[in-house]
Amino acid sequence: YYIGTNDRKTELFEGMWPLPKGVAYNSFLVKGEKNVLFDLVRVNTIDSYVQKINEIIGEGEKIDYIMINHMEPDHTSSIKSILEIYPDAKLVTNKKAVAMLNNFYEITDNIIEVKDGETLELGDKKYTFYMTPMVHWPESMVAYEETTKTLFSQDIFGGFGTLDGGIFDDQIEYDAHYHEETTRYFINIVGKYAAQALKALNKLADLDIQLICPDHGPIWREDPKKIIDIYTSLAKQETVDGCVVIYGSMYGNTEMMAEAVARGLSEGGLKNIKIRDITKTSNSYLLSDIWRYKGVIIGSCSYDNNLFPPMDYLMTEVSHQRMKNNYWGIFGSYSWSGGALKTLKKYMEEGKYDVLDTQLEIQGAATEEEMKKLIEFGKEMAAKILNK
């Protein structure tokens, strides 16, 4: 049974990532000889959660086991409240999560510790557990139920967005309403650990999976291979032939330069082009663009002899994500002393990025001749992307 809840009130996931479409906290109840809960919900949605449990097993009935696949508070902050209702429930989790249960909630009793590859028979169901460390916390694990061929995948295969009516992939328009939010979720939450995610996906590759139950986003029963392929592509950071131009401009001069660069990209034969104003766009979306586009051009004004602060913050985030499959281009502008281009060069060197040799720095507003150079700069990136 699906007993998850929707959260349309929280505006920022983890205090950072915008939730314009909200988020679902998925939880599952396996009813049988033993009643088993899989992961919980954030405490701010607990009232509707408990109501759903009661509707299925009846008020006064017991929960025998609570599976803790992932300790992040959006899945465990309700655990003390749930244990007050079901005090005899045993918690099933791994060694690292046992320590976290104590650290977060001072829970130390009634815990069954499982290991990688261990199978636990609970009533008429068998669950095999697989550790998936750093996807995206160190204690993360998944559980596979053999008789129904169901994978309880915690945050793996998850995405942003509430489940509005339909919960299964065959009940929704996934490509129209969820694909972008799944992509952004992966890049924002899991992206830094893409190598570990790919390792986890390979570890699970031999399982016969007919149903995927993630902790966020749609449940996959019709075409589970689709979300597996999407996550595999994201974990490999497979880019598309396109370019995102991200600029930081205080008074419009750097913006005009970015427009010239984009014109050059187009004249160079590139069709998939996106321009982003860093002052109006959350890093959540910018990181998602950078992850997916083969070409990335960063243009920034200088500020206090350094990089424009919003751009500096973005580049710090980029350096954390360990992106590897992009071509980069950089340009800077300044009024009386530089700083933007110098700092961008430093980020490029530290990240060992594949950056174009042409790196432009312009004082004040670009002249007609400098605009031509910016257009040529865009053409150079287009040729690199299209392998001309």
Feature locations, PLM:
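Divalent metal-coordination and catalytic microenvironments
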Residues: 30, 70-72, 143, 155, ...
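Active-site metal-binding motif and surrounding structural segment of the metallo-beta-lactamase
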Residues: 33, 44-92
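Active-site-proximal loop/helix segment associated with metal-binding centers of metalloenzymes
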Residues: 136-140, 156-191, 235-239
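Terminal amphipathic helices with adjacent charged low-complexity linkers/tails
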Residues: 214-240
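Conserved beta-strand hairpin/beta-sheet module of binuclear metal-dependent hydrolase folds
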Residues: 1-56, 142-145, 149-153, 254
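Active-site neighborhood of phospho(di)ester-bond hydrolases with catalytic His/Asp-centered motifs
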Residues: 38-40, 62-71, 91-95, 151-154, ...
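FMN-binding flavodoxin-like domain, especially the glycine-rich phosphate-binding loop
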Residues: 163, 174-212, 217-218, 260-276, ...
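Metallo-beta-lactamase
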Residues: 92-140, 196-199
